[in-house]
A protein has these predicted regions:
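Preference for the N-terminal adenyl/adenosyl cofactor-binding alpha/beta module
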Residues: 1-248
Length: 249
């Protein structure tokens, strides 16, 4: 297992995901310094759907409760976890659909879930929407839709990892996931496929390395007599998650 590659990806992915998630927030009139009217029907000239309006209101409420940075970090980490779990499952043939989400069967960055979209059989899949997006050649939008449906379908067997995505985490799913240099592309490029095979401990290493910079920041602050907040306790107390614990989780 190439732990250097895993660390390189995880550390970079945290920064990248927080930035991308935050960028989606801007699209909906939400920044660290300013939040537009929570009841707005449109933001930046874009008319919100009923679902978007509801999700945006939930996001704003969460930010008011926890703070902007904390919420952006939580959403970024949620998607990191989901991407990691999906990659592990597709490589090991654990996805119920047996259709890869990130690559084709040769491990090329050509998601099989897109090429097989009209043949998919997943709970919650609106085939009419699939055809509509395919006919309009909205590949990126189609991919995001299929990704969300796949996560929701996995809720039945892994409810802890794949909670139903009907809230602001869907709203903040980053754009351009199919581009060169995206988090998904880099995950495939940097971490050898063999490292995912039957080695569930990779999830533990990803977790540890993802939080490593934050952990360093927390302890650096401690040396300056800055107390650890409840939000930073997980990063400060993290330990490597061995194989048997990951399987139990």
């Amino acid at each position: 297992m190439d732990k250097n590659a895993i660390k390189k990806f995880a550390v970079w992915a945290r920064t990248e995901l927080i930035a991308r998630v935050s960028l989606k927030g801007v699209e909906y009139g939400i920044t660290e310094d300013n939040i537009e009217d929570a009841n707005a029907d449109s933001v930046g000239g874009k008319v919100l759907t009923a679902d978007e309006k509801k999700q945006r209101q939930a996001l704003i409420a969460e930010i008011n409760s926890k703070g902007y940075k904390q919420v952006m970090e939580e959403v970024a980490y949620t998607w990191f976890n989901r991407f990691s779990a999906l990659r592990f499952m597709e490589v090991n043939g654990y996805l119920p659909s047996h259709v890869r989400v990130f690559t084709d069967e040769e491990n090329n960055f050509k998601p099989q879930i897109i090429t097989e979209a009209i043949h998919l059989d997943m709970d919650g899949l609106d085939m009419e929407k699939v055809y509509e997006l395919k006919d309009a050649e909205k590949t990126e939008e189609l991919y995001k839709y299929l990704l969300i449906v796949q996560c929701n379908a996995l809720n039945k067997i892994l409810p802890g990892m794949f909670q139903k995505i009907a809230d602001y985490t869907e709203l903040l799913l980053p754009d351009n996931l199919l581009r060169e240099g995206s988090v998904i592309q880099q995950m495939i490029e940097l971490i050898p496929e063999d490292d995912w095979k039957d080695a569930v401990q990779i999830i533990g290493w990803l977790y540890q390395y993802y939080n490593s910079e934050k952990k360093d920041d927390v302890f650096a602050a401690l040396k300056k007599n800055v107390k650890i907040t409840k939000e930073n306790i997980p990063a400060a107390t993290q330990l490597f998650t061995p194989d048997w614990i990951v399987r139990y989780m």
